[in-house]
Amino acid sequence: LTIALVGSQQTKYEPSFSGSKTYQYKYEGVILTGLPEKGLARAGLKVHCKVEISEVAQKTYLLKILNPEIQEYNGIWPKAPFYPASKLTQALASQLTQPIKFQYRNGQVGDIFASEDVSDTVLNIQRGILNMLQLTIKTTQNVYGLQENGIAGICEASYVIQEDRKANKIIVTKSKDLNNCNEKIKMDIGMAYSHTCSNCRKIRKNTRGTAAYTYILKPTDTGTLITQATSQEVHQLTPFNEMTGAAITEARQKLVLEDAKVIHVTVPEQELKNRGSIQYQFASEILQTPIQLFKTRSPETKIKEVLQHLVQNNQQQVQSDAPSKFLQLTQLLRACTHENIEGIWRQYEKTQLYRRWILDALPAAATPTAFRFITQRIMKRDLTDAEAIQTLVTAMHLVQTNHQIVQMAAELVFDRANLKCPVLRKHAVLAYGSMVNRYCAETLNCREEALKPLHDFANDAISRAHEEETVLALKALGNAGQPSSIKRIQKCLPGFSSGASQLPVKIQVDAVMALRNIAKKEPGKVQELTMQLFMDHQLHSEVRMVASMVLLETRPSMALVATLAEALLKETSLQVASFTYSHMKAITRSTAPENHALSSACNVAVKLLSRKLDRLSYRYSKAMHMDTFKYPLMAGAAANIHIINNAASILPSAVVMKFQAYILSATADPLEIGLHTEGLQEVLMQNHEHIDQMPSAGKIQQIMKMLSGWKSVPSEKTLASAYIKLFGQEISFSRLDKKTIQEALQAVREPVERQTVIKRVVNQLERGAAAQLSKPLLVAEVRRILPTCIGLPMEMSLYVSAVTTADINVQAHITPSPTNDFNVAQLLNSNIVLHTDVTPSIAMHTIAVMGINTHVIQTGVELHVKARTTVPMKFTAKIDLKEKNFKIESEPCQQETEVLSLSAQAFAISRNVEDLDAAKKNPLLPEEAVRNILNEQFNSGTEDSNERERAGKFARPSAEMMSQELMNSGEHQNRKGAHATRSACAKAKNFGFEVCFEGKSENVAFLRDSPLYKIIGQHHCKIALKPSHSSEATIEKIQLELQTGNKAASKIIRVVAMQSLAEADEMKGNILKKLNKLLTVDGETQDSTLRGFKRRSSSSSSSSSSSSSSSSSSSSSSSQQSRMEKRMEQDKLTENLERDRDHMRGKQSKNKKQEWKNKQKKHHKQLPSSSSSSSSSSSGSNSSSSSSSSSSSSSRSHNHRNNTRTLSKSKRYQNNNNSSSSSGSSSSSEEIQKNPEIFAYRFRSHRDKLGFQNKRGRMSSSSSSSSSSSSQSTLNSKQDAKFLGDSSPPIFAFVARAVRSDGLQQGYQVAAYTDNRVSRPRVQLLATEIIEKSRWQICADAILASNYKAMALMRWGEECQDYKVAVSAVTGRLASHPSLQIKAKWSRIPRAAKQTQNILAEYVPGAAFMLGFSQKEQRNPSKQFKIILAVTSPNTIDTLIKAPKITLFKQAVQIPVQIPMEPSDAERRSPGLASIMNEIPFLIEEATKSKCVAQENKFITFDGVKFSYQMPGGCYHILAQDCRSKVRFMVMLKQASMSKNLRAVNAKIYNKDIDILPTTKGSVRLLINNNEIPLSQLPFTDSSGNIHIKRADEGVSVSAQQYGLESLYFDGKTVQVKVTSEMRGKTCGLCGHNDGERRKEFRMPDGRQARGPSVSPTPGLCLEKTATEAASFCVIM
């Protein structure tokens, strides 16, 4: 036994070849691409040959291929046979048969040597054969794993070794995970701007690759000999979840030993060079697109043919083949040399149409040759600035980067002599940063040569303090995104550089934003920097907010997020706190896999923070994040909106919107837009007069010089700026300054003679302008190339190409003709006739490919999606602004026009370069597979099991199974395709055309119900515009006309018979009375339900008698009235049934809870109940109150989301209701007893509120009078029933008509009428058909019925009687809060509207949850929708939404505009609708202004902070002032000498020194520049007209809006200062900084924070006001 063990240990398992023999193997390699199921088309190829291996030196062997043959496959798998590719075999035979040498030791293939004549493609095929010999045998283990080298790289391999002693063989099984590689061979193109979603890949992978090998080894004296080797490799791809199916590329190899002979082998005479290892070497497939194959020996000729085809066939409108032809042109240019491109350019540079196509195709070619040509043309000034910008920037983003290309770009971009155009240089610098990003994408540390030009440019700009170039350098460094650039960026970050704090805030923000792309490589370093910036409270709030945004984008750890939350607990800036808190809270709702860890961390952090931050209004900075991720699709999208505000103004200082996409286990930022509006609000509020032209205010400046620690707010140079990013790279940015605005205003006002551009355009339009525009674009080229085991590259790629064309012909006739002194403003008052013939069209071609791609052969699967749209527009527009007329006239549709065409089809393709005419392209879903299920026969279970057994034999066919016998066997299972066809047309008979839709779809979803299988197949749909011919006269032209003003009535063609409307009013009882009935507010109608139910029959009979009496006038109206009567009866019956049902439901609910009510406390029993009982027994309640009662009774089931919070808020409602409710309403008492939530309260309109207060105790006696009062209201007057067109002309008329050949007209007309009475404004809109016999109409009527109620009714159909919807808006109270109720109610709506309602109802709960609404299942009226908005505080409202099946509510919703509310508002009546609408502009305007009040020793700052301060006597304090470098006003306050309770005010505005002094008589004195102005002479206006002084109440009011002072009021005791919106964040003094930062209100002039308001002022500098009056000025800020 010992001897046997020792012998077994000496056995060598490593494969080897004897040096004296030549081994001949039979080799076969097959690769196929398609879906895994049988019965569908596949494409692939087979390579089989003889292989001889012999030793030529120590451990060096010679491999020679004999009798190679290549066969192609394209057909139904596995039925179709392989067919020989004879021409391709013949072309490659000379290379395939050339011997190669390789090193082979212990089963490992070393270096490979081959002749230079052998191409990389052929050598890779030989590597595939050698890969079969790669074995790593361990004698000490039978099962083991390791990282093994191979053709695909160094990947994880698992071995299992079995020894069969009886058969004297060793079986080795090897499997490789091609997704787990230390060094994976792959090539990614077009993915540099996306990054991997690691969490997505943990869940599912879109691509997987695996390989399995089986070896049979025969022991020999020197080791083992490989007698047979088989391999199977599978790559799968799906854009969706892999569990739902994927397309596969399957490769198989088989190497079988046939003979071993003792033959002397001669070494080849030609020199064999080292061509690398066994790893795959990329070759020509990098430049070879997988969708086209052609010979490139003479590309110039082919390029000219393609160019000619594109130019000639895409002038009028784009052709469907234009995108594919453009891709072909791009591929041909990739094969060109520099001389070829030069020759083509010289031939076509003078021809504008050809020139444009060439300049668009060269950047898409993206080769070094094309880029070099573009740079030479720019340096030689052969391109215009517009052409250079477009061509160079696109080329820099698409070109394949290497060291030479980067160096070439740097020499061009950073040499000012080359790029003299500022716009071109700006975009080129940004593009250079993006180029560096792609060049250094695979390495952590980028080469210094690439970054040096950017670093030098940044250092130079910062050293020269050049603001614009510094911003450009920072943005370029941000595009590059390299960690080595951090040191340059830190020079602009405060806290890291001594001079950075002096830079403008915009530069500091841009420096922080430049760290975002760097964080993708060095997240830890960026987190450290941004955290340090965030913690520095001395920095500007905007810088800190952007730092927190960048920090959270790096997805910090739980510990770092907790540190951030801890810092927020001590945060003094409300802007920073609001922004960061809202950002973290928004992330907690994220469902994207990439944010799982961050979402959990933020969820914990938010719980640590105060809920008060949730209640900050929208004046404070906010961050919003919304995303969705669908796991079945493994795709998602996200949107981020960051709103940054500096001074709590309505207009934010910055807005950033970013959109993200999750697809194919990667994340990309396709679009980001940023807008910075700092300084824009100030310009909008100011006049055009320049502040710089003001005379110096000497006294103010003299005081400012003496202020210790003065720190003026920096003035803005840039009013607004914007940028756009695509895929994380900033493409462009622009800035708006005062100079730009002045130039724009000047361009409008100056005569055309001085405006050369406008004059040229006007003259060209008068002569007639014609243009043929075309713009091709390679939208996407995304590729991944992987090697396969047989040595051919497998490619998965996506191409999107688009071509847009526009044929434009425009001619204008202007009356009167423009003269030399004609300006743009006068041009708008001319009569302009514009003849336009424009045909825009666009074609797009998307191709997804999976398969083999080389320069000699291509096989695989292609999915083609084509889209084409054409919108021909030929019309004549007439514009006459003086007459207020606009008219468009066009010809009718004469022939069928395909407006939109979409098609998608999957193919199995195979083509080789030697026989392009024999290329095959078969649908993946064959036609014979589409069979009707009715033709299928039922098979029993036995037959089915036999069929599966037979089919199982072919589940994994090996190379031997691919014989001719199998291909022709009848065992193949037939498939049937899912087939669907749709078609529909919508006719516009009045205009003689129809829009038709046709769709057809066939897919393979019958195999597997998944998104991928639904795409695979054939799909086609189109939308066409067709002429619709009728038996009547033909249509000659179509006209659209809009007329406003006094001539609107003249455009009305058909005058509607007014008696039909009058009759309808009489039968239905007055349109507004019906409206009032539909829109009765809950609790408003005091008639009991029972009494209303008993009166229904009499009401119906009276209505019938009324209709019958009116019907006796004519027989035609009789039939009409009978129809209307039936409809009315049906409506009433429906309403009665619903009212009875709601009443009974409410009654049952009350009975169930009667027992519970009797157990309430004693003081609850003492509440007035007589009125409740009488109301329930005699008065009853209407349907609305019943519904409310039912809602109230069911309101005790608190919402699951936040029971405690909701309950506490409901107590607030209870307390408010207890304090304000004085009526004896039983519903009120019940509500108080139940502690109801918001949805349980009944909304009480203003009239209902007054009615119960005035008539309590006499409910029964007042019901009839209330009813009569209601009937006598304004809604029931005869005057309201009239048609407004009888007494006033329409305010506008719109006519859409078709003029027929017989002179008649048909179409539609719309007219609007108004009644401008102040008390009850009213609007009516009437739309009718022009044809006299048509009764179709749309009637809309809206009226402000009272100060508290507005109503609108819309009816449409035959004489406006088929459908109707009513809407009302009523003010009132919800509990004790002023409220507004908007209610919509309908009786009949179209079926399409009902379907839309049902669809929306499915998404409402989810959307409401995302918006923070709570939900309660409640059966509300089925034909009613209600929204109630209750004002609970000046900054918040409660929202209640009642839909038919659900109730939604949200409390404390922040609103951007502060609503002025006094404490006594709870006891007063609600504001009326008229006052609300009138006050809305005032509220918005007031919300932009700030007010400060000082009375005795009490102060209220601009931001609402209250404090007390005892001023020392005789010392002036700065109450409020303009805190910028150029001070425009200052208001000072001191204690009057005559009394401690009186104050004296001094205001310095512009060049005026205004003193307002108290007197002992209780009045005030006014002095201007030390000259007393009697109050009797007020009002006063200075010479400039900017300062106004007037008497107000008991004091004086000063207004100087031009200088930022809205008003200054003083009456001797109280001072009130109100500043304009432009002064947000620009004031200082005792009134504060007016920036919304309540926690930082007591900042001192040098920026330090005081401990509180009670700190006594330090002795300030004293200044003599005059030589005789010594008045000290104590500087307090």
Swiss-Prot record:
Known glycosylation sites: 1182, 1202, 1217-1218
The family database entries (SUPFAM superfamilies) matched by this protein are listed as: Lipovitellin-phosvitin complex, beta-sheet shell regions, Lipovitellin-phosvitin complex, superhelical domain
PTM annotation: Phosvitin, an egg yolk storage protein, is one of the most highly phosphorylated (10%) proteins in nature.
Q: Which organism is it from?
A: Acipenser transmontanus
Q: Residue spans with biased composition (Low complexity)? A: 1098-1122, 1169-1196, 1215-1229, 1260-1273
- UniProt lists compositionally biased (Basic residues) regions at 1197-1212
Supply the alphabetized keyword list.
Disulfide bond, Glycoprotein, Phosphoprotein, Signal, Storage protein
InterPro entries listed in its UniProt record: Lipid_transp_b-sht_shell, Lipovitellin_superhlx_dom, Vitellinogen_b-sht_N, Vitellinogen_b-sht_shell, Vitellinogen_b-sht_shell_sf, Vitellinogen_open_b-sht, Vitellinogen_open_b-sht_sub1, Vitellogenin/Apolipophorin
| Expression induction or repression | By steroids (estrogen).
The UniProt function text for this chain reads: Precursor of the major egg-yolk proteins that are sources of nutrients during early development of oviparous organisms.
In what tissue types does this protein appear?
Answer: Found in liver, testis and undifferentiated gonads of estrogen-treated fish. Not detected in the brain and spleen.
Name of this protein? Vitellogenin
According to the UniProt entry, which residue ranges have a biased composition of type Basic and acidic residues? 1123-1145, 1636-1649
Write out the ranges of the annotated region (Disordered): 1089-1232, 1252-1280, 1636-1659
Residue intervals of the Vitellogenin domain: 17-655
Enumerate the spans annotated as VWFD domain.
1490-1675
Lineage summary: Eukaryota, Metazoa, Chordata, Craniata, Vertebrata
Q: Where is the signal peptide?
A: 1-8
Query: Is Glycoprotein among this UniProt entry's keywords?
Result: yes
Set out the biological process GO terms recorded for this chain's protein: cellular response to estrogen stimulus; response to estradiol
A GO MF term:
lipid transporter activity
The intrachain disulfides are 1492-1631, 1515-1674
